[in-house]
Amino acid sequence: MTTPRPVLLAIMDGWGLAPAGPGNGVSLANTPNVNHWMATCPTTQLHASGLDVGLPEGQIGNSEVGHLNIGAGLVVYQDSTRISESIKSGEFFENPAFLEAVQIVKERGTNMHLIGLIGRGGVHAYDIHLAGLLQLMAQQGVNHTYIHAFMDGRDTLPQSGLGYMRELQQTISQIGVGQVASVIGRYYAMDRDKRWERVGAAYAAMVEGVGHTASDPISAIEQAYLRDARGDEFIEATVITDSAGVALPRISTGDVVICFNFRADRVRQITRALMQSDLNTMIQEWYANQAEQGLQLPTTIWQRPEQVSNLHYVTMTQYDATFPYAIAYPPHYITEPLAKVIADAGKRQYHSAETEKYPHVTFFLNGRREEPFAGEDRVMAASPKVATYDLQPEMSAEEVAAKLLDAVNSQIYDFLVVNFANPDMVGHTGVIPAVVKACETVDRCLGQVVPAVVAQGGAAILIADHGNAEQMIDPQTGGPHTAHTTNLVPCILVADPATGLTREQISLRAGGRLADLAPTILDLLGLQKAAAMTGTSLIETK
């Protein structure tokens, strides 16, 4: 194999693989170029969903995660999956932030409090993460462990919380550690819109023991449903009492608090309420600003009573870069993405897309880095201003292709990456004739660009980051299917025969995933993959 130049990565966003049928926008389309390359060039199918891209098992892929994995050259586990996988491996129970919290609560002889959303909504928290913490407390002999349960009803059914609470009570009974000390809906505890009076109600229950009372959390929820049939999200603060009617331990001086939500946005305010020393000043300034803008203020402005002193606070993930608290699962930084390896080798690169997918070929592909690397040029075409893209399924693909063709013909770039957004963005409309046009547009654009790459002695890798356009009919309802899919995606290598990258000379390994693309591209460029890249090249010599 000789080194091709340039190497093009063309991402056909949302172009998945599925059997032909009336709902398959890809197979319904007239795509002579892609069909020809599929029939004559090295091809394989890639996994682009679930654990293969760092998402929970069975979860559909998406463009952000897809491009992140493509550029990182490794499976980038999302926070929720990192935590879940660490429970399976046992690393969870050796987490330094958790063990430090255990040590502190033992040394002080105080109480452990676990706060967060319960249930299996999976958007902000997972029940297995709370169960893992309870198991850890049992292992470490932290018997004085209290749970402040935020109820969902938004990412779960409105009155599903009763069942989830029964499951939690069963888990507590099996593990032998933990008591639910308070129950409150996420409407209050997880406000993110500076409605401090809502957060104040959660604070009052957890810290002051103020709210409705119930002898157990099941009764608390049943009583709440009678007060407000809207369900879990709107459960007013309820304090759980012991057999003598005394509230279970509140969050008090010297206690340890672990917030087990993995998603940050809806637990920043409750974290500030518990921990920020100048909270009241901040709240007053915010409301003053609201008043200056002529906005309506609440009847009473919540102000925190005296702050609980000497709390030790642990966040499950990084909730805010300015928070000085212990983090159990800090951000995973991608230090050597594909673009950096190429830049460090002194090579030139070109990243291109239209507006809808421009962040994906820049920020996400480059490992969540905003600034371009040395020798990296970025070119964007504006997406059309239409209400929905079925009205203009061609989008701005022709402009993207024209700019890309100019870049190829300039012969100054070693590596080029382009995203054609059409199959995904039009796929989200569920309008099959428009999706067909979208796929045909991408095929036509590739038919202009790929031959130019090959003519220069180069190679093009055609892939998708996830599926979408190949499933436009919901198999359950028969109605439109507008979401991404878990289907495999294509990977086609089209190259100048002189490079030795033909179907007769090489094959593309089966069973690959998006994380294998960066090592494959570096293999084509004759560069060593970064040490952190755990993906492997798809190219196999016959």
Swiss-Prot record:
Give the matching CDD domains.
iPGM
- Binding positions (substrate): H124, R154, D155, R186, R192, R263, A264, D265, R266, K357
Question: What is the free-text note on the cofactor?
Answer: Binds 2 manganese ions per subunit.
For this protein, the Enzyme Commission number is 5.4.2.12
Secreted recorded as keyword = no
* SUPFAM superfamilies (UniProt xref): 2,3-Bisphosphoglycerate-independent phosphoglycerate mutase, substrate-binding domain (SSF64158), Alkaline phosphatase-like (SSF53649)
**What residues does Mn(2+) 1 bind to?**
D424, H428, H484
Q: Which GO terms describe its molecular function?
A: manganese ion binding; phosphoglycerate mutase activity
Binding of Mn(2+) 2 occurs at D13, S63, D465, H466
Name what cofactor the protein needs.
Mn(2+)
Manganese in keyword set = yes
Into which EC class is this enzyme placed? isomerase
Part of which pathway? Answer: Carbohydrate degradation; glycolysis; pyruvate from D-glyceraldehyde 3-phosphate: step 3/5
GO cellular component labels: cytosol
Q: Where is the active site?
A: S63 (phosphoserine intermediate)
Keywords, A to Z?
Glycolysis, Isomerase, Manganese, Metal-binding
Describe its partners and assembly state: Monomer.
Q: Which family does it belong to?
A: Belongs to the BPG-independent phosphoglycerate mutase family.
- UniProt-recorded name of the protein: 2,3-bisphosphoglycerate-independent phosphoglycerate mutase
Species of origin reads: Herpetosiphon aurantiacus (strain ATCC 23779 / DSM 785 / 114-95)
